[in-house]
């Protein structure tokens, strides 16, 4: 019964303020509550501290069953909210919940969420829908008011600027890194499997995924998007905080593309943008911006960067070419005066620190050797401000810097100071910004005299500089020569010691000209990059006392010694022959891929290691050393060099300017094939050297094919014939030679060299029976000489006959 009376009384009472309702009003009808809200909204005097209807409040408190005699208005109930917790959707697909607290504004509540995520609240707006184009809510209202009128318990925080600056999402794909790459998080190599962003190329391990940045680097996408550049310009000019610095960094990196002159190009590309922090994951570092990049135009349309937002526009930034030229003349006069004073200061007491001090701008220190290419006479000294929001009034483009002011204050009374004072009014200055003025001490820019210790250090003679050595050059005191191994057409080979056993080849070069030395260094630069299993390792070169090269020592002997010198001569099996030819083709194909022509390929330069399974090619390259020139009629003519038995016909004729081609090495390889297959040198029946040169050069003479071993496969013989073709265009390259060698198939079983064993047996017996019975010959055979009696002789004859038939499978 009391419950019914409570409903009637509550329905009959006057509506109360939504700011101080009783918790028991939950059972009120919806129409009553909505009418309360509408009436309360229309009241201009609504206040969260004083109820609109105190009588109704007292009646509600009396209905609640509490005794409020004399204190009914002082004891207030907490307000009624439609939602106690509101879901807030933050930028970059983040979300959080905010509690509706009395008296807390929406700005304060949502700013806490944004600041925890390093998001600038001033760049954001709050809407009641996911669409950022809808009307934003008033952040000065309390969360109570917003919660009352919120259709759903959700709010959306939108920021066009933040999406522009850092909302480019990664396109992460799984990648196999061969060869391994360094992880951009921990800098350790990524072995095989890892992850990479297809947009910004950010690489990381799976274990480092939690430390990877959530968004891409803008430098990968901004150059392709003009609208994005304009938005970045707006951020850099109208906002403050970390987003402004990010926008300036990106625009500084893009300055050569957007509005910056070529002379103001930054020194180098930006470094790695990420570094690992054990407590906070990856932090993006700002780029090291050069003074030219930082003073470059932020907008492609205007010549000067826009100042930070202020109440008054910058009306003094005048794009006047005459003003720039006038300022340049002032700076030229200042530099001339400074050089004149330095020339008079011979004792060093008043040496200007302008040449010693590193050039810096806005706190970024550059090397002292680098000058401002736009205005090389300005030495930009930092103002020493600790406030990140403070700015200095300076002429556009950095024409008038603090060092110029410092020079005028430090050299008072001189021509320089008067010149500066006379022209200061002609320089355009930007209006003061909202930041407080900075106090600059004139003594900060004063030139310092040398101390006595510095004067003594300057007069002390410096030790002579050591001679500069080229890359991969080995000094004479770093290696030791043991004994001579052999000599060839281009030099003499010695065995020596250079951090291990090496081969030292002294080249037949006497007094090389500067051009020949330069060509030799270029070839050495190519040789030092060769790395292959079938190529001797190049270790360096020697300049003094004689030009020499140092290579890997081969613990074995050459193929020439194995075939023609050692006794007994080694006759390789056909499988070993093909394996040797394959390895030579592999090494030569690698050298030709590096544009290295051997010019002297022969069995003397093909080495077999001690294991007899690895082939090494040596004495390759060095065209400068292997070229001889003669003077004929005042003109230099190239002469053929090398060993004539392995020389290609076009090299012998020397009709072309450069007869050495990959096909000339293929011809030499064909002669090496002949040596291995025949165990003879070509043209061994001709003793006249000139006759060999003439006949081979004309195509009249080829190696004798009749001396090649008979078990040579036909496909290998055809390859040999193609390699020694007279026309070099008909010869294959080493890539094709290698494929044809791999296609050669040898029989697995070889023919027996012994006489065949023919078994005669009757057809009624199987072969297995004949074999089994033949094993019993030794036990059943009795020689005839053992017979003593006629009976034993007859028995022996019968046994011999049985053994005979047993041997031939007749029993």
Curated annotation (Swiss-Prot):
Domain Protein kinase: 479-744
Pfam families (UniProt xref): C1_1, PK_Tyr_Ser-Thr, RBD
Gene3D superfamilies: 3.30.60.20, Phosphatidylinositol 3-kinase Catalytic Subunit, Chain A, domain 1 (3.10.20.90), Phosphorylase Kinase, domain 1 (3.30.200.20), Transferase(Phosphotransferase) domain 1 (1.10.510.10)
Keyword Lipid metabolism: no
Region annotation (Disordered) ranges: 1-78, 287-314, 384-412, 427-471
Residues annotated as the enzyme's active site: 600
Binding site for ATP: 485-493, 505
Cofactor detail note: Binds 2 Zn(2+) ions per subunit.
Cofactor: Zn(2+)
BP GO terms, sorted: MAPK cascade; meiotic cell cycle; oogenesis; response to stress
EC id: 2.7.11.1
RBD domain mapped to chain residues: 84-160
Reaction(s) catalysed (UniProt annotation): L-seryl-[protein] + ATP = O-phospho-L-seryl-[protein] + ADP + H(+); L-threonyl-[protein] + ATP = O-phospho-L-threonyl-[protein] + ADP + H(+)
Keywords attached to this entry: ATP-binding, Developmental protein, Differentiation, Kinase, Meiosis, Metal-binding, Nucleotide-binding, Oogenesis, Serine/threonine-protein kinase, Transferase, Zinc, Zinc-finger
Binding of Zn(2+) 2, residues: 183, 186, 205, 208
Class in the EC hierarchy, top level: transferase
Binding site for Zn(2+) 1: 170, 197, 200, 216
Polar residues biased stretches: 7-19
Zinc finger feature spans (Phorbol-ester/DAG-type): 169-216
Protein name (database record): Raf homolog serine/threonine-protein kinase
Organism: Caenorhabditis briggsae
Gene designation: lin-45
């Amino acid at each position: 019964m009391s419950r019914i009376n409570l409903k009637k009384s509550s329905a009959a009472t006057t509506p109360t303020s939504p700011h101080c309702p009783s918790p028991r009003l939950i059972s009120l009808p919806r129409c009553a509550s909505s009418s309360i809200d509408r009436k309360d909204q229309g009241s201009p005097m609504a206040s969260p501290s004083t109820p609109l209807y105190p009588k109704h409040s007292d009646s509600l408190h009396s209905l609640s069953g509490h005794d409020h005699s004399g204190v009914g208005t002082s004891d207030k109930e907490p307000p009624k909210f439609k939602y106690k917790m509101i879901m807030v959707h933050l930028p970059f697909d983040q979300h959080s919940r905010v509690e509706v607290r009395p008296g807390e504004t929406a700005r304060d509540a949502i700013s806490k969420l944004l600041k925890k995520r390093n998001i600038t609240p001033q760049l954001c707006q709050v809407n009641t829908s996911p669409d950022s184009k809808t009307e934003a809510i008033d952040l000065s209202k309390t969360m109570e008011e917003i919660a009352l009128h919120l259709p759903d318990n959700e709010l959306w925080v939108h920021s066009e600027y933040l999406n522009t600056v850092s909302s480019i999402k990664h396109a992460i794909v799984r990648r196999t890194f061969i060869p391994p790459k360094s992880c951009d998080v921990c800098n350790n190599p990524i072995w095989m499997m890892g992850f990479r962003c297809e947009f910004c190329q950010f690489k990381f391990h799976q274990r480092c995924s939690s430390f990877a940045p959530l968004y891409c680097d803008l430098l990968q996408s901004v150059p392709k998007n003009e609208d994005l550049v304009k938005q970045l310009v707006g951020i850099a000019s109208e906002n403050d905080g970390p987003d402004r610095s990010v926008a300036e960094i990106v625009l500084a990196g893009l300055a050569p593309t957007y509005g910056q002159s070529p002379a103001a190009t930054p020194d180098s590309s930006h470094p790695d943008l990420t570094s690992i922090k054990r407590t906070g994951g990856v932090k993006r570092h700002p780029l090291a911006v050069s003074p030219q990049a930082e003073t470059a135009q932020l907008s492609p349309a205007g010549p000067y960067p826009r100042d930070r937002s202020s109440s008054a526009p910058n009306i003094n930034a005048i794009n006047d070419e005459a003003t720039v030229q006038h300022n340049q003349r002032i700076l030229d006069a200042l530099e001339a005066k400074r050089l004149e004073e330095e020339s008079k200061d011979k004792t060093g007491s008043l040496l200007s620190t302008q040449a010693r001090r590193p050039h810096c701008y806005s706190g970024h220190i550059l090397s002292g050797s680098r000058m401002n290419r736009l205005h090389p006479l300005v030495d930009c000294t930092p103002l020493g401000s600790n406030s990140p929001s403070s700015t200095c009034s300076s002429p556009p483009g950095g024409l008038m810097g603090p060092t110029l002011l410092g020079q005028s204050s430090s050299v008072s009374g001189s021509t320089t100071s008067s010149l500066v004072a006379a022209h200061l009014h002609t320089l355009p200055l930007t209006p003061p910004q909202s930041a407080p003025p900075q106090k600059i001490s004139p003594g900060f820019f004063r030139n310092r005299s040398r101390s006595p210790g510095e004067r003594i250090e300057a007069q002390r003679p410096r030790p002579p500089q050591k001679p500069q050595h080229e890359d991969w050059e080995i000094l004479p005191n770093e290696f030791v020569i043991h004994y001579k191994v052999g000599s060839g057409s281009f030099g003499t080979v010695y065995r020596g010691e250079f951090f291990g056993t090496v081969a030292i080849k002294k080249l037949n070069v006497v007094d090389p000209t500067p051009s020949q030395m330069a060509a030799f260094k270029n070839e050495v630069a190519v040789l030092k990059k060769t790395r292959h299993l079938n190529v001797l390792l190049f270790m360096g070169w020697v300049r003094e006392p004689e030009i020499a090269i140092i290579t890997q020592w081969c613990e074995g002997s050459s193929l020439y010694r194995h075939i023609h010198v050692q006794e007994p001569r080694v006759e390789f099996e056909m499988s070993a022959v093909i394996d040797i030819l394959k390895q030579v083709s592999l090494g030569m194909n690698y050298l030709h891929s590096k544009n290295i022509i051997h010019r002297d390929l022969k069995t003397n330069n093909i080495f077999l290691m001690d294991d007899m399974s690895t082939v090494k090619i040596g004495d390759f390259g060095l065209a400068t050393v292997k070229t001889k020139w003669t003077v004929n009629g005042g003109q230099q003519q190239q002469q053929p060099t090398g060993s004539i038995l392995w020389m290609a016909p076009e090299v012998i004729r020397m009709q072309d300017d450069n007869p050495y081609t990959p096909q000339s090495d293929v011809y030499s390889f064909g002669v090496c094939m002949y040596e291995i297959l025949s165990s003879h040198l070509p043209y061994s029946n001709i003793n006249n050297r000139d006759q060999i040169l003439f006949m081979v050069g004309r195509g009249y003479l080829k190696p004798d094919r009749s001396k090649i071993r008979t078990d040579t496969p036909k496909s290998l013989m055809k390859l040999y014939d193609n390699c020694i073709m007279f026309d070099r265009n008909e010869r294959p390259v080493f890539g094709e030679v290698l494929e044809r060698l791999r296609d050669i198939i040898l029989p697995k079983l070889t023919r027996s060299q012994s006489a065949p064993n023919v078994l005669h047996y009757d057809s009624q017996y199987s072969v297995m029976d004949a074999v089994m019975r033949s094993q019993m010959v030794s036990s059943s055979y009795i020689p005839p000489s053992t017979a003593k009696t006629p009976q034993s002789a007859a028995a022996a004859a019968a046994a011999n006959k049985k053994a005979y038939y047993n041997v031939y499978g007749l029993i």
